Each structure stands twice: as structure tokens, then as C-alpha cells.
Amino acid sequence: MRYAVCANGAIVAEVAGGRTLREVSIEKDLVLDLYRRVRDLPITFDIFADSTVYTERARFSLIDELDLSDATKDFVRSVRTVYDGSFEDQLARVGNVCRLNVFYRRPEDRDAVCVLIDDVPTLRHTSSLPCNIEVTDSSAHKGAGLRWLCDYLGVSPADCIAFGDGDNDRTMLEAAGDGVAMANACAATLEVADHVTASCDESGVGLYLAPIFSAIASAR
């Protein structure tokens, strides 16, 4: 893999060289204001910055209570760095914030957070799990990241195939010439897909690409 669109399109990276080619950050004043509005809710408020996911120690145990498989919860814990002290101090220590993540248990907490985000024109939210909210700058999403990378490489998005199953994949499927939803995709992603392949557990990406690669090889 040479390039990666990360953090819901907020970062485009050259993997081999370890270079960040593009980063769209959230203003720290907005991050702090949003945190202060939601801090009394039983949620996490994770900061994505400096290639690290920072989670407040007092909120880390909420992951245990999420309606997720044990394997998914183990993964979520493994990619987080717990910090002590105040959120304000931690925010001041880190570099650019490219994304925020909120885990919640109750629908009313989700709704309360989303209403606040919707009130800020420069923010957007999406999700990849049934219990999370992913927040980026309004211009940062996977579709925008794909289009930027295509422009950087001199490739037309019309010649790209994109696969996805979450709501956060929807803009990417719309941007690509062939947007392919996994069979296990959420309804919003299935709705915008050009095609549907087998589920993630059934190796849907490989099944879809195999005949395409075979046809390319035969044409040479």
C-alpha cells in the first residue's frame, strides 16, 4: 500500500515515506467549546492528533459497556492512549486535531451531541459503528480525501473502485466511479452504491476484484 486516506479523509498520507500529504484540522477553540458542552454526558471524547488517539482516563472504562463484540472492544482499547489530567491541558499539549470520536450508550446522548455539532457550520459528523460519532472539519470526509489523492496522482475518480460498509464510507462511494457496498453495509451506504458485493466476513472485496484483475491480466 503506497497511499492511505485516514481519519475520515482528514489526512492523506504516503505510507512508504511516512509523509502526510494533506491534513484538514479542527480549530482547537471549536474542540474545546464542544467538549465543554458535552462533558457531563456519559460519553467518551477522543482526540485524534499526532497519529494518536487520546482518551481521558475517567472515560476509558465506558468502552467496557458498549454494545460491541469483545474483539471490537479489544481493538478500540488497543489503539487508544489514556491520559491523566484535564482535557484542556491535554488539548494544549497535542498538535493539530484532525478528528474527534464520541462513544455513547444511550440514543439521547447521541442526539444531544449531534444537535450541537449540527449547529457549527464548519463541523460534520458521521459514524462507523452503531454507538459512535465521528467529527471532522466540514470539508474533511472520505470522498474529499479520495478526490484530493486522485488529483495528486493525476488519476480520475471515475477510474476508481471504492468499497465500504459504514455511513462514513458513503461520500467515498459517491466520489468513486464504482462505489461498491458490502452486503453488511448500513442502509445509507447501500442506497448510494453502484454495486453490492459479499459481506466483509465473506471476503467481499476479494470476490469483487478477482474477475477484474483476471480480465486485466488476460488483456496484457
Predicted regions mapped to residue ranges:
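Short hydrophobic/aromatic-enriched beta-strand-loop microsegments
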Residues: 1-7, 125-126, 179-183, 197-198
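Short, hinge-like loop/turn segments at secondary-structure boundaries
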Residues: 1-2, 21-24, 62-66, 143-144, ...
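Alpha-helical substrate-recognition element adjacent to the catalytic core
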Residues: 1-31
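Conserved acidic, metal-coordinating active-site core of Asp-based
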Residues: 37, 41-44, 48-163, 167
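Mg2+-dependent phosphoryl-transfer enzymes with acidic/Ser/Thr/Gly-rich catalytic loops
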Residues: 118, 133-220
